[in-house]
A protein has these predicted regions:
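FIC/Doc superfamily catalytic core
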Residues: 1-154, 158-235
């Protein structure tokens, strides 16, 4: 399934795993490729399957809209794709594709109150969109501030990381996947950025993940000159 399928599977697996998904890489691949899971003795949580499928749809939505500027509506549309099929969220009364209406907290980070979310997101989006071309540092700052606001009831990390991938594509920056095995480093760097406004550790972390993604995808990339020469020879 090429670079698209590989990225779909690895991004969905790792981003959900960071948030506590119990699905394995093999199960994620099966769900993506066949829409089903092989019968196994272990129990599988319905929520894990629903969120994995939702992440596949969110990734596709991101690819359709990667060149669009960030907006309330676009960010909410990503969250809707991720969460609209999750029964547990609906049963708990969580808003899907809309900003939170209840307080939430992440570790020792004080997130925005529900009544503060719209204004704080407006400021974040507005300040970000004032620039035309963005660097990885700009994306790092945005991600940190987005996660500190925590605008949705649940799914903020996954929505935030899909925005990172989107903005990398839009700004011709090597994209990356935050790997679950590096979750500790990710959270530590995110905490430093959120609490102390020290964005360097998070930037360094993202640069390391860029190298990992580049190495993973190298076999699928054909140099432009090789492609031109191949087309010329075939003519």
């Amino acid at each position: 399934s090429g670079i698209y399928g590989l990225t779909q599977r690895m991004l969905a697996y790792n981003s959900n795993k960071i948030e506590g998904s119990t699905l394995t890489e093999k199960q994620t691949a099966s769900l993506f490729e066949t829409g089903s899971l092989a019968q196994e003795e272990i129990l599988i949580r319905a929520k894990d399957v629903e969120e994995m499928t939702g992440h596949f749809m969110m990734f596709n939505e991101m690819l359709k809209t990667y060149d669009q500027p960030l907006s309330h509506e676009l960010i909410k549309s990503y969250h809707f794709k991720l969460k609209s099929g999750v029964f547990e969220d609906m049963a708990n009364g969580y808003l899907v594709g809309e900003y939170k209406n209840r307080r939430n907290q992440v570790g020792n980070i004080q997130t925005a109150l529900p009544e503060e979310v719209y204004d704080r997101m407006s400021t974040l989006i507005g300040d970000y969109n004032e620039k035309i071309n963005h660097t990885l540092y700009d994306l790092t700052v945005f991600h940190s501030q987005f996660e500190m606001i925590h605008p949705f009831q649940d799914g903020n990390g996954r929505t935030g990381r899909i925005i990172l991938f989107k903005e990398c594509l839009k700004n011709n920056i090597i994209p990356f996947i935050v790997n679950d095995v590096n979750k500790g480093d990710y959270y530590h760097a995110l905490s430093e950025a959120s609490l102390n406004k020290d964005y360097v550790p998070l930037l360094d972390f993202f640069q390391k993940e860029q190298k990992t993604f580049k190495k993973m995808s190298e076999g699928f990339i054909i140099p432009y000159n090789d492609l031109i020469n191949k087309d010329y020879i075939e003519q």
